From Swiss-Prot:
The keyword Ribosomal protein applies. InterPro entries: Ribosomal_Su5_D2-typ_SF, Ribosomal_uS9, Ribosomal_uS9_bac/plastid, Ribosomal_uS9_CS, Ribsml_uS5_D2-typ_fold_subgr. Residues 111-130 have a biased composition (Basic residues). Keywords: Ribonucleoprotein, Ribosomal protein. Pfam families: Ribosomal_S9 (PF00380). It comes from Ruminiclostridium cellulolyticum (strain ATCC 35319 / DSM 5812 / JCM 6584 / H10). Coiled coil: none annotated. This is Small ribosomal subunit protein uS9.
Length: 130
């Protein structure tokens, strides 16, 4: 028999997270590693757990996640977005709380492209009067 699970895709910067919520006791598996192994910084762990703590479902679901691309902060944001979307599939009544916290909104901020004649996106070469 197939297991019941709720699926959500989250994105942030260059990161894409495919998240599965399985009824369980609150374990996290990110790319086959635990949450503590994958994210070293405490702030990133908090970001990942935010939707579950907000909706009091931290001990109701196990989170299985595959995330690719970007850096650690982008990946944490993508996982948060994916968990929020998966929670909606589990219980549509959580929408107002998640929406108010801003977890359902895809953060549109992306890296600005480098322009020719400049060192970075906006950093100009050093100016010398003489």
């Amino acid at each position: 028999m197939a297991k019941v699970y709720y699926y959500g895709t989250g994105r942030r910067k260059k990161s894409v997270a495919r998240v599965r919520l399985v009824p369980g006791e609150g374990k996290f598996s990110i790319n086959d590693r635990s949450l503590d192994d994958y994210f070293g910084l405490e702030t990133l762990k908090v970001i990942v757990k935010q939707p579950l703590t907000l909706t009091d479902t931290l001990t109701k679901f196990d989170v299985i996640c595959k995330v690719i691309g970007g850096g650690f902060t982008g990946q944490a944001g993508a996982i948060r977005h994916g968990i929020s979307r998966a929670l909606l599939k589990a219980d549509e009544e959580l929408r107002p709380a998640l929406k108010k916290a801003g977890f359902l909104t895809r953060d549109p901020r992306m890296k600005e492209r480098k322009k020719y004649g400049l060192k970075k996106a906006r950093r100009a070469p050093q100016f010398s009067k003489r």
